[in-house]
Amino acid sequence: MERKVFSGQNLIWVMLLLVQLRGYKCCIEKERKALLELKKYMISKTADWGLDSVLPTWTNDTKSNCCRWEGLKCNQTSGRIIELSIGQTNFKESSLLNLSLLHPFEELRSLNLSGEIYNEFNGLFDDVEGYESLRRLRNLEILDLSSNSFNNSIFPFLNAATSLTTLFIQSNYIGGPLPIKELKNLTKLELLDLSRSGYNGSIPEFTHLEKLKALDLSANDFSSLVELQELKVLTNLEVLGLAWNHLDGPIPKEVFCEMKNLRQLDLRGNYFEGQLPVCLGNLNKLRVLDLSSNQLSGNLPASFNSLESLEYLSLSDNNFEGFFSLNPLANLTKLKVFRLSSTSEMLQVETESNWLPKFQLTVAALPFCSLGKIPNFLVYQTNLRLVDLSSNRLSGDIPTWLLENNPELKVLQLKNNSFTIFQIPTIVHKLQVLDFSANDITGVLPDNIGHVLPRLLHMNGSHNGFQGNLPSSMGEMNDISFLDLSYNNFSGELPRSLLTGCFSLITLQLSHNSFSGPILPIQTRLTSLIVLRMHNNLFTGEIGVGLRTLVNLSIFDASNNRLTGLISSSIPPDSSHLIMLLLSNNLLEGTLPPSLLAIHHLNFLDLSGNLLSGDLPSSVVNSMYGIKIFLHNNSFTGPLPVTLLENAYILDLRNNKLSGSIPQFVNTGKMITLLLRGNNLTGSIPRKLCDLTSIRLLDLSDNKLNGVIPPCLNHLSTELGEGIGLSGFSQEISFGDSLQMEFYRSTFLVDEFMLYYDSTYMIVEIEFAAKQRYDSFSGGTLDYMYGLDLSSNELSGVIPAELGDLSKLRALNLSRNLLSSSIPANFSKLKDIESLDLSYNMLQGNIPHQLTNLTSLAVFNVSFNNLSGIIPQGGQFNTFNDNSYLGNPLLCGTPTDRSCEGKKNTKEADNGGEEEEEDDDDEAAIDMVVLYWTTGSTYAIALIGILVLMCFDCPWRRTWLCIVDAFIASGKSMFS
């Protein structure tokens, strides 16, 4: 009997052991059903296009172990769910979360509902338990609600989760005062993250959260330093984040210096000013101190020498000036990251020192420190991962010893200095990022650069003076994704190894050099290449077959070379990824292929300055944002396709041979610049142009347009719309080269190197006539340029006074037309006008004296009209010379030499611009009436005199009749 009992006990223990070893086949059935109900609820809130991605491993299969489903973790003993994550769901709209769906998970310890961009929970509800719902989850310790659309309505629900120790609510953009008192029952809370939530006002009391060890209030709108006193009660606080708020004034030492347990203090991105508090040196437990991006000045306090635990110190982007000693860092044995820079050019960091560093840094970032020489302490570093010495006036040789002493160095940034000699180590190195752009380096690239630096991911050597050919060893850089050698003096043909070996290249920029020979003459292996910029070189011949192998090419710029051949044979027909194509100022010829403008993603096309001819294609891609088209300075003929007007954002067709009228088109609101200067367009200006409410630059000059100027042109927008700019833009399809490396991580702070280059950014340059010259506008000046040019046409009639409503207009040119009547006094509303040209017309009347109020007017030309009266004086009119008024003999006064003595001064002191305009028009009308009466009376008197002579018999009458008979006789003889 005892043996049977013993055997039975052994069997039970064996079964328990097997269960422990193998685990449960599935979670508890009750929780399985609850999970499926939760999934069903999530599906009901998800957009149709995201249904397949909703928890796909959560299946209604009894053989499936739900403890292995995504986002779950089970207790190995009980089989109950202890961790649940249901983020990454594509909701069709913001939705409430039904908390009752979570009640079956009785042992749940961690709940992650973070959106991470995708989720859009905006509230919580429970129709049965109400605000007490979360009290049912008695074991819940960690709750993550970050990156959603929650508001303050969730706080009463959270107050019931009394077991919480960690709560993340960041990135919900809640706004308003922080209702921390509504969390008074969370007495066990140790970590609270409220960052990036839009809170403002004062920082409230935290007296009921005495166990709090980590608090993050970063990226809110707190501004008062007084309320920081409320944080003093948190005596157990070890981590405090107040970065990116609006805190200003001196750093409150009575607050931070009393937090003796602080290990991490993040105050970056505020407006703190003054010197660093000496008492910060008493925080001997401090490991992380970030004071970057403030307005601090002074020097490092000597007390910092006592921060024995300090590992991370960032003082970058402040206002430090004068001599800056690094002596207080000498004994910081644990220091790993040191960052320092200044917005002031007066900072002079100590480079020569007698102390030997006791630390081994992984990050040494000292840009904008006016070093002059590399600091001595870097010589003793052997564990560096990142070194940034950019913008420091350093000269001489590139410091290759940094690579030799630090075999694990990943990032070396030396840009914007005065280095003259480029050297590399003799042994292979693991360097991944090398930036030596904007220096004074000459000579050639070392032949072995590809052998020594085979792991490079990013190399920028642009804006130097390199010469010679590119070394063939560069083809061994198999991992390189970004290579920029633009703005140098390289020459010769591109090495074949570069085109076949660097198969990881995403961006290749070789512009502004002297490279020659054909472009891409061979098949390449650059299948990952997205951006290829080769403009401003000496490339010749046709574009080679290698272009067809660039299957992912999106941006191709070969402008300003000597390329020949046909466009149709140069660009592959299957260039479906192409978004930017620039081949301007070459020798390309032939017609424009319709397939080119039909490429779906094409957003920027510049073929200007070539020998292209024929009709423009009518098939244009219907882009949501509009296509930017530059085809000026070619020989295109035929009509202007309506599809170009309907789908272009910028359309530049200047100096071609287009004919016909400007077609009627459907306004899509895309057009912002329309340049049709120098063609053979005829007909009237269509009123459809008035519907271009976003237009900024309109040039119809030097054509054969006739008719009147539509008054509705005052509907043209002269206000920069939201999101509309001309100086530069990135396409809606954006490709960039990114690189991210993490060098240090703490509770709320991550020190990482992030490199992102937006390869689609373009600086737009547009030519427009202003101030009597033809200028190119780009950059910031283009963003403020508004212009209307209708000059050199056959327009007639009056100048519409409504054009004065274009208050932001900077250039208006109506010269060389057939315009009559007077100059509208309403032009005085053109407050920003800089250039006003009305010359070579048939304008009459006076120059409105209200125009003297145009304080920005720099060029004013009304020459060769029929204007009369006294030239106004005052303001900018005192700066114009006689050339502005030539060909108007009835104008008098300064700056002409014609006296106005005896003429009535037409400047009257009246009350409004409209009344003045009526007065000017009346004066012009009176002049014409006098002219008509004078002419009529002259003819009447002459006729009466002839009749009188014919009524009396006198020698004069007989003589007159003889003359008439003679004319009649001669007429008969001529026609007989």
UniProtKB/Swiss-Prot annotation:
PANTHER family: RECEPTOR-LIKE PROTEIN 14. One of its GO terms (cellular component) is plasma membrane. It comes from the Eukaryota. The keyword NADP does not apply. Keywords: Cell membrane, Glycoprotein, Leucine-rich repeat, Membrane, Receptor, Repeat, Signal, Transmembrane, Transmembrane helix. Residues 1-26 form the signal peptide. It comes from Arabidopsis thaliana. Gene3D superfamilies: Ribonuclease Inhibitor. The gene is RLP14. SUPFAM superfamilies: L domain-like. Belongs to the RLP family. Residues 950-976 are cytoplasmic. It is a single-pass type I membrane protein. Residues 898-910 have a biased composition (Basic and acidic residues). Residues 27-928 are extracellular. Residues 897-922 are annotated as: Disordered. The chain crosses the membrane at residues 929-949. Glycans are attached at residues 60, 75, 98, 112, 151, 185, 200, 331, 416, 460, 489, 552, 633, 680, 813, 826, 853, 861, 866. LRR repeats lie at residues 105-127, 137-160, 162-185, 186-209, 210-233, 234-258, 260-283, 284-306, 308-331, 333-358, 359-381, 382-405, 407-428, 429-452, 454-477, 478-501, 503-528, 530-549, 550-573, 575-599, 600-623, 625-645, 646-669, 671-692, 693-715, 782-805, 806-829, 831-854, 856-879. This is Receptor-like protein 14. Residues 911-922 have a biased composition (Acidic residues). It is found in: Cell membrane.
